[in-house]
């Protein structure tokens, strides 16, 4: 088992990585490291063996904590790209292409989506509004930071 997957599983179990976006982002980062560090065993085909390694890793993570919907979509994407990887490419080229695809997926589906939500939600906060939240959400935090950036007069009160 790759060390990044083990660390992520422990973080899921103890709750130190929580929230849908944070968990999906951490999953993609761990899968990226797994792919980047992967070495094809002698006599194996990258797409088949890496697919099995990803399956085993996901099984471990599900045992630590069930996947959210966005995480399930990310796993489907990564597995489909691994299965499609060309046997004609050298292993280093195939790994590089897979890492680039994971990075692009992460940018589009996690980072861009979070920025779009923050942009839209920040528009609902106006001068003089009081916003009280309970708990922590990356999307809510990003929205409030964007609203704070837009407003001229600001007052903040944070409670731990």
Regions found by a protein language model. Give the residues of each.
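Short glycine/proline- and acidic residue-enriched helix-loop micro-motifs
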Residues: 99-107
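Distinct, well-ordered alpha-helical segments
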Residues: 141-149
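Short internal beta-strands
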Residues: 154-160
